[in-house]
């Protein structure tokens, strides 16, 4: 059986297959805006403009100005640079103005934000407003919204500024009505204070809500008032006082302020028999008071109808009461008030001391007005006077305060100055004390120094110019014989002046008081004791007594110490050659040696005494220490002298130096005989001294000749020729006059002292020669040798110009030996050593080159430093 597959759903048979028909898609409906219309949220054109302005850039003007400036710069680049800068100034001014304006706006906005967020220090600054929340109550809820915590200070100020709270408490029947009025007035009084549009919208909403909420309460209060008025009108006729009292009680309660109560309290004791009711006060003072209340209520249209009805009723009752009682009580009340005012004015006038005016009695309104106006005028006048007086007092007080400030500043300045003066005074006193202490110390040290120094008379007498010239001529005439300088100081006994003390710094010769160097101490320890016997004390005496000296030595010591030094010529350089020691051992005649020694002693005394005067001129600050043997320079003048044409010798001219011839030139004619006797006595005393000195000199010479035999040289003839050239010539110059005799005696005493000093120095040199080595008897560690075996010794001799001596001059061998031996000692002293050439030269301080030939003719001796 065969199975055939057949379409199950298809028609049987060979029928045609049918096609499905597609359904059309449902058309989508448009948006239905009828339910929620969103076009109300679309911004209006005004909002769009406002938003557009809000989002504009604030720097638009600045950008515009910058663009203009760039354009101007481009324009200026194209144009010449000499164009005016007016446009640039305009742009700078615009920029300054605009920037200041924008900065001011920013500052104002910032300050506004700060003020809104700031919390005021006082109650009303910034003003605080009472907020009224917009709360929607539930439909079935009778509870009011939650209470708002109000500021009590602001609330009390607002209540007092609008209406008196005591008046509200005194209301009996119309309390609710008064509260309603107070609320309405409170809300109305706050309206003008809100100036912004947002606050206006909020107040409108609040009033609308308040109207809806309180409409029932207001209607109820209004019906109660109408019922009471109707009941009172039924009981009494319209003109009865009860209706007036009932209507006026409310007005009196509303207007019973503190001022009215004070006036009423002042009138009650005077009119205790006739008490004044509050209704009269309200009639007199507040007859037209309801009109401002009505004008306040008319500000809002929502409350207009109810307020009109209520105020019309009140005003009608008030006017009816005024018409009834104005004729009875108004004049009495005014009289009492005027009397009270006048009484107060009289008391014020008495209190201030002004003239008291009597009461002006007047009947009717005319007298009342006159008294009131006069009282007001007086009050105003008194007020002006008090104000003027107050201003004067204020000005006076300001002046006094200014004066007080000035006085305080002066007091402060004086106090500071006094303190400064005190400090300065203390500092000055401290410096004075210190200065006194130092001065005392200096005085003490000066006193000790003066006590330790010898007494020296440094006063020198100077003769007149003609006398100096005459003495110079006399000296020039005696060229062949040696002449002693006339400027030799006289002994102390020949002068009538007082002795003058000099400190150590002003002594003619620097006296060495310090300890000797170690080398000299070692040398002195090897010498015999008889060499250091006391002779002439050129240093201050160290012994406790003068018993160790002989009388002659004591006289000689005092004479040497008290003699001032005369002035001598400038620097002399003595250059000596080193000689062999074989010539020193040859014998020499004692007479020739004495003559040469006298010449050297005079030169040494002359040089040493004149070196001290050089310290005063401060030309050569070199000192000769007398504690060591000085350098001797032989002063000799042979008979034969070279002519000035062949050799230019510089000899000193003593006529330029001041001569001291004695006291005889300064005596008057009246006392001539007395002074001459004194001079003769002095001459005799000097003669005795010279004889004693010569005797002592002969003894010392004989003893010194025994020790000095090894030092003599075989040049007796030269010195023998010098002896008759020196001393006989001196003896031939004895003048006959008194002054010349005094000078001659003075010269002889000086020569004797010089010889004595020379012999003492020779004894010391002999001891040094015997104890020294055979190669160099006295060898100084400070000698300066030249290449040729010569040494240079520089001696300061101020005031003399000298050169090399003439070729005919003969040099004393003993003087040469003495100068060579003493060179080592001078090298240890203050005289400088200078290694120069072998030839001797003299360097004068004040050269006189133009007078060379004249000086060579007039000179009487020459400084000879040549050694054979």
UniProtKB/Swiss-Prot annotation:
Q: Where is this region: Disordered?
A: 129-154, 172-201, 229-250, 291-326, 630-664, 702-722, 805-868
Basic and acidic residues biased stretches = 706-715
* Keywords for the protein's UniProt record, in alphabetical order: Cell cycle, Cell division, Coiled coil, Cytoplasm, Cytoskeleton, Mitosis, Phosphoprotein
Name a single GO biological process: metaphase chromosome alignment
Q: Which domain of life is it from?
A: Eukaryota
Q: Where is the composition biased (Polar residues)?
A: 190-200, 229-245
> What Pfam families does this protein map onto?
SPICE
**Role, per record:** Regulator required for centriole duplication, for proper bipolar spindle formation and chromosome congression in mitosis.
Q: What is this protein called?
A: Spindle and centriole-associated protein 1
Instruction: State the species of origin.
Output: Rattus norvegicus (Rat)
């Amino acid at each position: 059986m065969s199975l055939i597959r057949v379409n199950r759903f298809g028609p049987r048979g060979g029928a045609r297959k049918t096609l499905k028909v597609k359904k059309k898609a449902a058309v989508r409906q448009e948006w239905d805006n009828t339910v929620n219309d969103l076009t109300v949220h679309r911004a209006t054109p005004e909002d769009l403009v406002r938003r557009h302005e809000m989002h504009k850039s604030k720097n638009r003007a600045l950008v515009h100005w910058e663009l203009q400036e760039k354009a101007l710069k481009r324009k200026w680049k194209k144009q010449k640079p000499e164009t005016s800068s007016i446009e640039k100034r305009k742009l700078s001014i615009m920029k300054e103005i605009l920037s200041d304006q924008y900065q001011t706006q920013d500052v104002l906005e910032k300050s506004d934000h700060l003020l809104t967020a700031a919390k005021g220090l006082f109650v009303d600054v910034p003003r605080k407003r009472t907020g009224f929340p917009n709360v929607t109550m539930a439909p079935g809820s009778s509870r009011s919204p939650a209470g708002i915590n109000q500021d009590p200070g602001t609330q009390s100020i607002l209540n007092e500024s609008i209406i008196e709270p005591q008046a509200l408490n005194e209301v009996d029947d119309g309390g609710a009505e008064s509260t309603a009025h107070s609320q309405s007035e409170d809300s109305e009084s706050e309206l003008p204070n809100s100036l912004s549009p947002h606050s206006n919208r909020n107040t409108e909403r609040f009033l609308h809500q308040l109207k809806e909420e309180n409409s029932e309460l207001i209607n109820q209060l209004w019906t109660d008032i109408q019922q009471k008025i109707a009941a009172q009108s039924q009981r009494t006729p319209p003109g009865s006082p009860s209706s007036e009292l009932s209507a006026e009680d409310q007005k009196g309660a509303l207007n019973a302020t503190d001022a009215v109560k004070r006036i009423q309290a002042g009138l009650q004791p005077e009119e205790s028999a006739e008490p004044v009711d509050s209704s009269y006060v309200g009639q007199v003072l507040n007859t037209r008071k309801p009109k401002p209340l009505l004008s306040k209520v008319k500000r809002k249209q929502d409350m207009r109808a109810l307020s009109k009805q209520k105020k019309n009723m009140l005003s009608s009752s008030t006017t009816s009461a005024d018409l009834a009682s104005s004729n009875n009580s108004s004049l009495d009340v005014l009289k009492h008030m005027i009397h009270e005012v006048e009484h107060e004015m009289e008391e014020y006038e008495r209190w201030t001391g002004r003239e008291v005016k009597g009461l002006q009695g007047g009947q009717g309104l005319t007298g009342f007005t006159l008294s009131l106006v006069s009282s007001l005028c007086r009050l105003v006048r008194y007020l002006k006077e008090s104000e003027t007086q107050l201003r004067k007092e204020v000005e006076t007080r300001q002046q006094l305060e200014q004066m007080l400030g000035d006085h305080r500043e002066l007091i402060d300045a004086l106090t500071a100055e006094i303190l400064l003066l005190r400090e300065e005074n203390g500092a000055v006193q401290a410096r004075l004390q210190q200065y006194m202490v130092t001065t005392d110390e200096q005085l003490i040290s000066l006193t000790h120094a003066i006590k330790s120094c010898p007494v020296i008379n440094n006063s020198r007498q100077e003769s007149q110019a003609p006398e100096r010239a005459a003495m110079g001529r006399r000296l020039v005439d005696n060229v062949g014989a040696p002449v002693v300088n006339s400027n030799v100081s006289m002994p102390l006994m020949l002068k009538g002046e007082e002795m003058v003390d000099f400190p150590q710094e002003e002594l003619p010769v620097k006296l060495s008081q310090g300890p000797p160097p170690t080398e000299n101490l070692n040398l002195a320890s090897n010498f015999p004791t008889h060499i250091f016997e006391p002779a002439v004390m050129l240093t201050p005496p160290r012994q406790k007594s003068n018993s160790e000296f002989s009388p002659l030595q004591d006289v000689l010591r005092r004479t040497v110490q008290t003699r001032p030094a005369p002035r001598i010529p400038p620097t002399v350089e003595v250059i000596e050659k080193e000689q062999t020691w074989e010539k020193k051992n040859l014998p020499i005649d004692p007479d020739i040696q004495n003559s040469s020694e006298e010449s050297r002693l005079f030169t040494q005394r002359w040089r040493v005494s004149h070196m001290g005067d050089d310290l005063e001129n401060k030309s050569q600050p070199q000192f000769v220490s007398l504690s060591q043997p000085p350098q001797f320079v032989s002063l000799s003048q042979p008979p034969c002298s070279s002519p000035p044409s062949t050799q230019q010798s510089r000899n000193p001219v003593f006529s330029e130096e001041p001569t001291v011839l004695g006291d005889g030139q300064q005596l008057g004619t009246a006392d001539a005989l007395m002074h001459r006797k004194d001079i003769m006595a002095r001459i005799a005393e000097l003669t005795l001294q010279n004889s004693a000195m010569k005797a002592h000199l002969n003894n010392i010479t004989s003893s010194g000749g025994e020790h000095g035999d090894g030092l003599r040289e075989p040049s007796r003839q030269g010195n023998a020729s010098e002896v008759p050239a020196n001393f006989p010539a001196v003896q031939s110059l004895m003048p006959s006059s008194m002054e010349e005799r005094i000078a001659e005696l003075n010269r002889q005493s000086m020569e004797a002292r010089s010889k004595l000093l020379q012999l003492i120095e020779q004894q010391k040199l002999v001891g040094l020669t015997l104890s020294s080595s055979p190669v160099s008897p006295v060898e100084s560690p400070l000698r300066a040798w030249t290449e040729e075996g010569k040494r240079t010794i520089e001696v300061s001799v101020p005031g003399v110009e000298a050169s090399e001596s003439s070729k005919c001059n003969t040099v004393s061998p003993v003087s040469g030996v003495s100068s060579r031996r003493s060179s080592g000692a001078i090298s240890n002293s203050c005289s400088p050593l200078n290694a120069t050439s072998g030839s001797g030269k003299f360097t004068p301080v004040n050269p006189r080159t133009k007078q060379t030939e004249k000086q060579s003719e007039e000179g009487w001796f020459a400084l000879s430093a040549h050694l054979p």
